[in-house]
């Protein structure tokens, strides 16, 4: 699809734009067992007062993004000045990169006594280790001013509040 976007832009002048998202974290959608879903499930278990069993190794970095940033990035790209866009097939966008151990530490600051243990799934481990530690979003930053608004700390605070309200 990305090369087709380039072709239609160069051949017919079609204004095509797209993004490559990292793992998306949302308080709206329940975790469904995907490789990045541990980063959503941890908040649900923390709010419930449960010990969280993480199936990703503690040292694996993965790029993540909070849903509000993902939505804003999409709108910002669609509203960007086409004259400033050099790329047409797809833009990498990034927000934060962390390990399960890093997110555990942040959650524990907000939920004292939170506990997490590891039971690494070999298939998910292999998948997660095959991904890049971080995405290079230089083109998005330079061509249309992409900049995330949420970091791990602010996302954690918001996720815990919204998940708690949802579970009431």
State where each predicted segment sits.
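Active-site Tyr-X1-5-Lys
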Residues: 1-17, 46-48
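Short, hinge-like loop/turn segments at secondary-structure boundaries
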Residues: 34-37, 134-135
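Residue-level signature of the cytosolic catalytic core of signaling kinases
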Residues: 31-35, 148
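C-terminal substrate-binding subdomain of Rossmann-fold SDR/epimerase-dehydratase oxidoreductases
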Residues: 55-57, 63-168
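Residue-level detector of anion-binding/catalytic polar loops
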Residues: 15, 51, 147
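A conserved pocket-lining segment of Rossmann-fold NAD(P)-dependent short-chain dehydrogenase/reductase
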Residues: 18-32, 41-65
């Amino acid at each position: 699809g990305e090369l087709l976007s380039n072709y239609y832009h160069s051949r017919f002048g079609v204004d095509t734009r797209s993004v490559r998202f990292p793992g998306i974290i949302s308080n709206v959608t329940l975790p469904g067992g995907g490789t990045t879903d541990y980063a959503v499930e941890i908040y649900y278990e923390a709010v419930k007062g449960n010990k969280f069993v993480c199936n990703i190794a503690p040292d694996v970095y993965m790029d993540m993004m909070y849903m509000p940033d993902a939505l804003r990035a999409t709108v910002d790209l669609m509203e960007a000045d086409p004259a400033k866009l050099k790329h047409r097939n797809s833009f990498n966008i990034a927000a934060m990169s962390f390990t399960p151990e890093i997110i555990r530490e942040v959650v524990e600051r907000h939920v004292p006594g939170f506990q997490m243990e590891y039971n690494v799934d070999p298939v998910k481990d292999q998948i997660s280790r095959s991904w890049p530690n971080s995405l290079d979003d230089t083109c998005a930053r330079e061509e249309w001013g992409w900049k995330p608004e949420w970091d791990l700390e602010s996302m954690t605070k918001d996720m815990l509040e919204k998940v708690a309200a949802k579970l009431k």
